[in-house]
Amino acid sequence: MARYRRHSRSRSRSRYRRRRRRRSRHRNRRRTYRRSRRHSRRRRGRRRGYSRRRYSRRGRRRY
């Protein structure tokens, strides 16, 4: 049972990786560009709010 499970998992992983790599090479550029733009806007807003809170706390503590 253990040998059969390990073998099946290794085969499924290899097939999944091969299919993913072939598709990712072609579609990865457009997807990463769209994702990076969306994530950058979200991260900038979150980072600015978080940084302001952090700096305000640090400034109050330091002063």
From Swiss-Prot:
One of its GO terms (biological process) is chromosome condensation. Testis. PROSITE patterns: PROTAMINE_P1. Coiled coil: none annotated. One of its GO terms (molecular function) is DNA binding. Residues 1-63 are annotated as: Disordered. One of its GO terms (cellular component) is nucleosome. The keyword DNA-binding applies. Its main location: nucleus. Keywords: Chromosome, Developmental protein, Differentiation, DNA condensation, DNA-binding, Nucleosome core, Nucleus, Spermatogenesis. It is found in: Nucleus; Chromosome. Belongs to the protamine P1 family. Protamines substitute for histones in the chromatin of sperm during the haploid phase of spermatogenesis. They compact sperm DNA into a highly condensed, stable and inactive complex. This is Sperm protamine P1. It comes from Dasykaluta rosamondae (Little red marsupial mouse).
